């Protein structure tokens, strides 16, 4: 869900500042795709951190770090702007690597290590369907509803939307912390 929110709305949000004279000529507005590409660079680096974090902190904590990273990413997007607040956008893009990799990659590794060989490919398929299929669909429909309800005419209250997305990620993280109980031998 969080991945689809960020994929669907980060660029339109940043480029929406073009309509505000103060920000229209800023680097972030003029080159939003370059700014957003920092996310992919961060992702490439953060994937290298997963073995260390998995061994040291275990699957549950690594996935919780990812969920908190989504909260931070959305919060920074809500608080930032392409002018004096561009550093928040940049930090948000860098946090993306932790948010994406620590959830998706470690989740796939957990499924890989905790399912029998006879059902492993089906379990991986189910994980992908739930995160990138059903989760993506529900996420985009819900996010679009939030964006629509905070848009009047052509003006969207993006700050409120990003804070709602951050609150959602926080609630999911809390629920995950309470209900996810990996076996001790599988936790690290």
PLM feature spans:
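Extracytoplasmic gate region of multi-pass secondary transporters
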Residues: 1-33
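Loop-to-transmembrane helix entry/capping segments in MFS-fold secondary transporters
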Residues: 29, 115-128
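Helix-to-loop junctions at the C-terminal end of transmembrane segments
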Residues: 45-59, 147
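C-terminal ends and interior cores of transmembrane alpha-helices
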Residues: 69-82
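Hydrophobic core of transmembrane alpha-helices in multi-pass small-molecule transporters
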Residues: 87-102
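Intracellular juxtamembrane helix-capping segments at the cytosolic ends
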Residues: 102-116
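A membrane-interface helix-boundary motif in multi-pass transporters
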Residues: 145-169
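Multi-pass alpha-helical transporter architecture, strongest
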Residues: 161-188
């Amino acid at each position: 869900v969080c991945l689809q929110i960020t994929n669907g709305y980060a660029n339109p949000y940043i480029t929406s500042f073009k309509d505000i004279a103060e920000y229209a000529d800023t680097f972030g507005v003029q080159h939003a795709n370059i700014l957003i590409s920092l996310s992919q660079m961060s992702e490439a680096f953060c994937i290298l951190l997963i073995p260390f974090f998995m061994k040291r902190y275990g699957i549950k904590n690594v996935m919780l770090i990812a969920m908190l990273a989504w909260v931070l990413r959305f919060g920074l997007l809500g608080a930032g702007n392409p002018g004096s607040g561009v550093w928040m956008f940049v930090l948000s893009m860098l946090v993306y690597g932790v948010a994406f990799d620590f959830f998706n990659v470690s989740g796939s590794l957990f499924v890989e290590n905790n399912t029998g060989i006879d059902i492993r490919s089906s379990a991986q398929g189910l994980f992908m369907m739930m995160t990138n299929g059903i989760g993506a669909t529900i996420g985009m429909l819900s996010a679009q509803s939030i964006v629509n309800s905070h848009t009047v005419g052509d003006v969207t209250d993006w700050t409120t939307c990003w804070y709602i997305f951050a609150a959602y990620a926080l609630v999911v993280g809390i629920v995950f912390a309470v209900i996810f109980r990996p076996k001790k031998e599988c936790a690290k």
